[in-house]
Amino acid sequence: MSPTNNGRNKKLGPRRKVPGRVSKSKSRAKVQAGDAKRVLDANALKWEKVDVPDTLGDFGGFYGLEEIDGVDVEVVDGKVQFVARDESRLKSPADAVDGTDMVEVDEDAGMEDVTEFRNLDDVAEGELSALSDEGSASEDDGSDSSGSSDMDEDDDQELQSEIFNKDIGLDEAEAPELPSWTNTMKLSATVLQGLSRLGFSNPTEIQLQSIPKALDGHDIMGKASTGSGKTLAYGIPILEGIIRDDTDSRPIGLIFTPTRELAHQVTDHLREVGALLVKRNPYSIMCLTGGLSIQKQERLLKYKGSARVVVATPGRFLELLEKDQTLIDRFAKVDTLVLDEADRLLQDGHFEEFERILKHLSRARKFTNGKKHGWKTMIYSATFSLDYFNKLSNTSWKKMKKAPSENEMEEVLKHLMTKIPFRGKPLIIDTNPEQKVASQIKESLIECLPTERDLYVYYFVTLYPGTTLVFCNAIDSVKKLNAYLHNLKISAFQIHSSMLQKNRLKSLEKFQEQAKKNQALNKPTVLIASDVAARGLDIPGIQHVIHYHLPRSADVYIHRSGRTARAENEGVAVTICSPQEAMGPLRKLRRVLAGKAGSKGKRWQNEIALLPVEPDIVSQLRERSRLASALADSEIATSSLSKDDNWLKKAADDLGIDVDSDDETKDTFLAKNKTKKLNKQLDKSTSKSYKMELNALLNTPIRKDARKSYLTGGLSNLADDLTKKKGHSSIIGHDKVDALTLLKSKSKRAKR
């Protein structure tokens, strides 16, 4: 310590000015040479990763941290600029382009940089090894001749491991034989390989009609039932645009979706089909939504060749555009603009952000190309009808006037052309002009009192085990039904708009994992959702959809029901309806969904069949339902009161005032709300008693026809069925039943 202190006592500070002047003169020489004090891009600096402890979790979506020393940060006109103090902070010449600009990096180095910061959750299975193979191949640029003999020995292995070298074009890949696709449209080997790998051997009707027209450059307005493959109907032409484009950087497709979950689903689907493109550039197809770091998204957008296809929600994309004029200029050159679930995007209250995006891009495109609008526009949805957006409770079904079916799409198109800048009149492709709900969906109805909705949900999932998706109009109903089913020992999960996006995705993953386990055990798995999951989401294996409440509009009913019977599979949609709903809203819904405008009489009222209900089984479930409902109400009321009290205390502490309990009674609404919740609470002894009683009932087997005598008596030997595991898994004496088979057989008998 003494030498250091002595050095300080000698005041060596002023002496350091001499080397400072020398370094200043040297820096002037470097400035003259164009090598120092230049504004550098963040990607040109030697960032070092910071290890994040595993005990800290994922920071709620935090992907990683990097740091750098010896770099000055300057803010000029609101923009952050980096200035390196010395050349050691810059990337080595091997990582930079051989030229004058240190910001531009060569394509190989850029891709190494991309993979360095990539989130491991985004990497598909088997992709890491493929990327490492690609990196080693790029390092040995001159080794093609030495390894040619080995490659000739196995052409198939060469196709798999070396196809992504830049010496080989994507179109040179071997195309699989898919005559159903190639006989009707001209597709590249890249797309054909993706279709073959995913098992899409035949195009759907909407794909068959849309893709050739889109490849020819037409604007398209496409309508098809849910689960019919609309994503690939617009996705394949966009992927073909990337392959045929020579610039290797210009954006090709811009796709907008109404929800974040749908945007991620579309992105994953396009990446699977265009796997060869993604392997060549992992960020050629990007998803830009809220709930994720906007700084990381801005950074990824700067990589060379990134964001050739962007799937985005309007809010986040608008935020990115308005922060950076270069992004506006860049995406103004886009070839194709797509609106998925266009009817939802263009409804009142959802169009403002999209309209601002169009204004930004239109102005930039007009300035650069001298044209106001020049991109190809494609819009798709399962519902294009002005009647669908009317509230079912607003107008009487008797006063409704339905336009002729041949003019319906024309009427909607006139409405859309006032909002969307088409180049001309788009082609209308309607694969189901008379059919609103997919033909694979068998609809059914349960009539009950409003207070018995929970009971009949329990009855349905008990009698028909499988994967069931229940839709509610209110978030409170979602929470209550979730607690109710948990009390009945049924695997239930919830998803609604009040949940964080991270928790929504976790809930979906847990539901799918539990569904696989319960399928082997023949037990029910239930996902309870608000309308956040109604549009576009492709949740695999949904067998039944239950409308806990009648939807507020017909388009919501169509999209809810479309979560089952995906990709030509079959499914069941059940509506639980109270007498009040049956009088008006249900009749209006059936009238809107009628097949033809000129249908005679009132046959449309009888199109939906009643689900057969067995009263003896319902009577055995009623007491269980009452106890589970009371416990669920108590749990939710207790949790809600605790949150209200904590919020009030926190607000009072922030304001520096005392909380007076009498203040709550002065507000009539708060007082009534609190009283209502207090009335639902159960004391500890009552709650414990209810739980014990409920557990005793759950341990008592349910018997068909309430049989409690000898198992070996009667027409069927129940003991033999139990030992051989015949019959229903939860109800003794009941045959295995399937809701779809039951409704099919009932419809056949009705036709006879």
Swiss-Prot record:
Residues 1-33, 127-157 are annotated as: Disordered. The keyword Coiled coil does not apply. InterPro entries: DEAD/DEAH_box_helicase_dom, DEAD_box_RNA_helicase, Helicase_ATP-bd, Helicase_C-like, P-loop_NTPase, RNA-helicase_DEAD-box_CS, RNA_helicase_DEAD_Q_motif. Residues 211-402 form the Helicase ATP-binding domain. It is an enzyme of class 3 (hydrolase). A motif (Q motif) lies at residues 180-208. GO terms for cellular component: nucleolus. Transmembrane segments: none annotated. It comes from the Eukaryota. Pfam families: DEAD (PF00270), Helicase_C (PF00271). CDD domains: DEADc_DDX24, SF2_C_DEAD. It catalyses: ATP + H2O = ADP + phosphate + H(+). A motif (DEAD box) lies at residues 340-343. SUPFAM superfamilies: P-loop containing nucleoside triphosphate hydrolases. Residues 454-609 form the Helicase C-terminal domain. Keywords: ATP-binding, Helicase, Hydrolase, Nucleotide-binding, Nucleus, Ribosome biogenesis, RNA-binding, rRNA processing. It is found in: Nucleus, Nucleolus. Its EC number is 3.6.4.13. SMART domains: DEXDc (SM00487), HELICc (SM00490). Belongs to the DEAD box helicase family. DDX24/MAK5 subfamily. ATP-binding RNA helicase involved in the biogenesis of 60S ribosomal subunits and is required for the normal formation of 25S and 5.8S rRNAs. The Q motif is unique to and characteristic of the DEAD box family of RNA helicases and controls ATP binding and hydrolysis. This is ATP-dependent RNA helicase MAK5. It comes from Eremothecium gossypii (strain ATCC 10895 / CBS 109.51 / FGSC 9923 / NRRL Y-1056). The gene is MAK5.
